[in-house]
């Protein structure tokens, strides 16, 4: 089994990588993993999580290994990784919710459940339904009209404090 963490420093209101990298290392050590058992990547641009996930899934498949990926970011980072591993039966994707919307988390559980690294590393896989659209893969919601316009504009405003 191979493990990969994809961290998006641009997701949410603040960069999650500073606090999360040491937490991941500590949780991995508690799980009995060596540093060679897992990889942590920080995404650098839109689409990077998809590229990293696809490359890792291909490499694991060629080696006959399974791959478990966790994304730390928002729904966009999660969906990039889901799209990247699409078609690879050896790969599973988990979500650490550090984005601004986190629709996936609200659909399937609570923030406490999803941010518990020990539980995430020890947990099993759960199959969910996804929907393929002309614009990509969806695991929670597809919207048109006002909802879509609001979602499209969020990157411009996500780090502006509301109060």
What are these regions (language model features)?
Residues 8, 49, 75, 131, ...:
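A residue-level signal for conserved active-site and pocket-lining positions in enzyme catalytic cores
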Residues 15-16, 80-82, 105-107:
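Short glycine-/acidic-enriched loop or helix-start segments at secondary-structure transitions
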Residues 71-79, 119-122:
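A short, flexible low-complexity segment enriched in Lys/Arg and Gly/Pro that occurs
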Residues 77-89:
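Short Gly/Thr/Asp-enriched flexible loops that form oxyanion-binding sites at enzyme active sites
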Residues 86-163:
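Catalytic core of DAGKc-family lipid kinases
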């Amino acid at each position: 089994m191979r493990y990969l963490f994809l961290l998006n420093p641009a997701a949410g209101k603040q960069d999650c990588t500073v606090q999360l990298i040491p937490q991941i290392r500590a949780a991995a050590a508690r799980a009995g993993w060596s540093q060679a058992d897992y990889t942590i990547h920080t995404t650098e641009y839109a689409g990077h999580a998809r590229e990293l996930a696809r490359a890792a899934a291909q490499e694991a498949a060629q080696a006959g290994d399974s791959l478990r990926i966790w994304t730390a970011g928002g729904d966009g980072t999660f969906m990039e990784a889901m799209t990247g591993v699409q078609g690879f039966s050896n790969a599973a994707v988990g979500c650490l919710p550090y984005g601004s919307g986190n629709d996936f988390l609200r659909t399937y559980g609570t923030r406490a459940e999803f941010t518990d690294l020990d539980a995430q590393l020890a947990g099993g896989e759960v199959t969910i339904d996804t929907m393929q659209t002309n614009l990509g893969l969806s695991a929670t919601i597809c919207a048109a009209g006002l909802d879509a316009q609001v979602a499209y504009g969020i990157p411009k405003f996500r780090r502006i404090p509301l109060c």
